Amino acid sequence: MLITFNFEVHQPHRLNKEINQNGNTLWEKYVDTKLNKEVFNKVANKCYIPTNELILELIDEYDFKVNYSITGVFVEQALEFNDYVLDLFKDLVKTGNVELIAETYHHSLTSLFETEDEFIEDIEMHRKMYKEIFGFKAKVFRNTELIYNNRIAKIAKDLGFKAIFTEGIEKILGWRSPNYLYQSPDGMKILLRNYRLSDDIGFRFSARDWDQYPLTADKYAIWLASTPGEVINIYMDYETFGEHHWKETGIFEFLRYLPIEIAKHEHLEVVNVSEVVDRLEPRGEIYVHEFATISWADTERDVSAWLGNKMQRISFEKLKDIGKFIKENSNKLKKLNKFDEIYKMYKVLQTSDNLYYQSIKGLSDMSVHNYFSHFDTPFDAYASYLNILYDFEYYIKELLAKSEFDKNNRRKDGQKQYEKDDEVKKESLINTNIIVAKDDKTESIYIEDEEGKKNKRYERDEGFIIA
């Protein structure tokens, strides 16, 4: 039995609750840099740094293997707020025991757009980041929050990926097990997350009312060993360690002893995801229509976490409208040297978290949404996001209108200057006398001004006529 441990590493650029009207740039107006720095460094100290250091030890001592999907917006914040975190991830990749899984740079919902160009653009941006920061070329792709359908799988396959990750949910499997490799109708290999075994760590580890509490490394290894199939893919938020479950819960001790306990079961082997793809053959086909798109979010495991209510859908449609407007006016914005700044902000606004905060689901799902949100209520999140969208749109339109106004003024000023110059020329001709001096070879043209001075203008060969 092959085992993979996979972790999502992501931090969004959280937006200001109120637009900063004193901001000199779009970033200062819309992005809460202070809050982002506070959150990033808090999570770095509680999760990223201790977990990375521990996994480096586990690799060194037990040849442990893990896989990460690291978003571009996370890397941007690491570079700005805490480069030691990024250095640790680089060290992990250099061990050769860590595989990076590709995803969307901005952790966006572009895969749900009508056209695929922005989705592909976000993936290619992410690929470029992996190459520049880590010197790594990813072979396996996972979409934002494991959002998946046949179309998404085909796009990933066309981009050259060997396999794609998604949720091993019953509605796509029926009676089948998630513990095998599958393929899409287009032949893209599919890795399925075992959500029960993943959530045992990710959500239930510190739940004292859980009938399996406390979860120990030896107990979990026994569960893995007794699970039938060919591969178990464990996938969770990296902040599981130290942030969602604090150090005091014993989560780090669990992770420290997990490789030791797994090694006690000879038929278990911890591998990287590309090894699974290379060593196993697909056991069947998974068909997921666009209208039945799945994800790993909430109990429904569909896209309702981001598009489940009217507020979210209004926000999503407005965002797409602004994107179309920016593209239609891209050449004008480039001439104004404003396109890059505007397009980057548009990309930041695409991050799925902005719509996730607007969910109004109940019970356990709502508590998870609230946990991640920096807004008091989903309605505050909606009002703030829509306010930024409309302000952003107004800024672009005002910029273009001012440019057109200035252009028209320059045209009018140019016309007035032309007319003025024309009048001066006419006056000049009236107040001057033209004298022609000829010799055998050339004729010289002189203009005699009002003071009687002769100014030679040019010479011309024969045939010159003055009317």
From Swiss-Prot:
It is an enzyme of class 3 (hydrolase). It comes from the Archaea. It comes from Methanocaldococcus jannaschii (strain ATCC 43067 / DSM 2661 / JAL-1 / JCM 10045 / NBRC 100440) (Methanococcus jannaschii). It holds the Pfam family Glyco_hydro_57. Its EC number is 3.2.1.1. CDD domains: GH57N_MJA1_like. One of its GO terms (biological process) is carbohydrate metabolic process. It catalyses: Endohydrolysis of (1->4)-alpha-D-glucosidic linkages in polysaccharides containing three or more (1->4)-alpha-linked D-glucose units. Keywords: Carbohydrate metabolism, Glycosidase, Hydrolase. This is Putative alpha-amylase. The active site is at E145. One of its GO terms (molecular function) is alpha-amylase activity. Belongs to the glycosyl hydrolase 57 family.
